[in-house]
Amino acid sequence: MSLLTEVETPIRNEWGCRCNDSSDPLVVAASIIGILHFILWILDRLFFKCIYRFFKHGLKRGPSTEGVPESMREEYRKEQQSAVDADDSHFVSIELE
């Protein structure tokens, strides 16, 4: 029986499931995954501003420089800047007459 055709119906004044194979491990796993997905969706809707603000701004910071000497920090900054400058040379400048 397909999961899409299983319907809960009132049986003897209680809600029950007509399917006999509800103890099947695949059905149990699908139910657990569905419940977890629903919980994560609710949390996402409740805290989406905090979550996306963290990913937007929090991950833009570079690697931690705690405990690194200032000379090595400056060298790292120069390497990063030279990498950016090198990428600029890949663009073609087209001038219209």
From Swiss-Prot:
Assembly and oligomerization: Homotetramer; composed of two disulfide-linked dimers held together by non-covalent interactions. May interact with matrix protein 1.
Origin species: Influenza A virus (strain A/Korea/426/1968 H2N2)
Identification of the protein by name: Matrix protein 2
Domain comment as written in the entry: Cytoplasmic tail plays an important role in virion assembly and morphogenesis.
Residues bearing PTM Phosphoserine: 64, 82, 93
Top-level taxonomy: Viruses, Riboviria, Orthornavirae, Negarnaviricota, Polyploviricotina
HAMAP family in alphabetical order: INFV_M2 (MF_04069)
Functional note: Forms a proton-selective ion channel that is necessary for the efficient release of the viral genome during virus entry. After attaching to the cell surface, the virion enters the cell by endocytosis. Acidification of the endosome triggers M2 ion channel activity.
Residue positions of covalent lipid attachment, annotated as S-palmitoyl cysteine: 50
Subcellular location: Virion membrane; Host apical cell membrane
Stretches that traverse the bilayer: 23-43
Family, similarity comment: Belongs to the influenza viruses matrix protein M2 family.
Example GO molecular function: proton transmembrane transporter activity
Virion surface side, ranges: 1-22
Activity regulation as described: The M2 protein from most influenza A strains is inhibited by amantadine and rimantadine, resulting in viral uncoating incapacity. Emergence of amantadine-resistant variants is usually rapid.
